[in-house]
């Protein structure tokens, strides 16, 4: 039972780290990255659809993306979705493809992006600590119900703390890498 709690907690912490990593990928760094469009939705036959599912996105140059819609009729809605997103980019429509030039980030904008990255990292660490708290509550309940002794539960709590520290450290590393990437000119 203790092993199940530890395994479940570790799995949920791992998922949280992965979610945080995916969140940080969407932060614009001044380099072209197709993943920056993962959260951009366009109306497609009345259904909000990610533009990554409506088009192919390629990176011909370090600061340019080319978006080629699978259906030319969806070009306008994709263009509007990008323009209305909070990415701060402006697509150019040449009739066949959309070209998106990624502007160089200003020092101030870089610092803002670092703050956003740190905020997302902190959210990830809070989620990990919430998983830890829930695991601790489950362990205490096992002890209270008399299923396991104090020593076994204390050892499990210590193990849960080690697991928590490991995943919090992973989030810190991911955020530090993103910060370095953002501050690189």
UniProtKB/Swiss-Prot annotation:
Gene Ontology, cellular component aspect: cytoplasm
Localization (cell): Cytoplasm
Key words, A-Z: Cytoplasm, Protein biosynthesis
Listed GO biological process terms: translational termination
Annotated Pfam families: RRF (PF01765)
Family annotation (SUPFAM superfamilies): Ribosome recycling factor, RRF
GO MF annotations in UniProt: ribosomal large subunit binding
HAMAP family (UniProt xref): RRF
Family the entry assigns: Belongs to the RRF family.
Function: Responsible for the release of ribosomes from messenger RNA at the termination of protein biosynthesis. May increase the efficiency of translation by recycling ribosomes from one round of translation to another.
Name of the featured protein: Ribosome-recycling factor
Gene name for this UniProt entry: frr
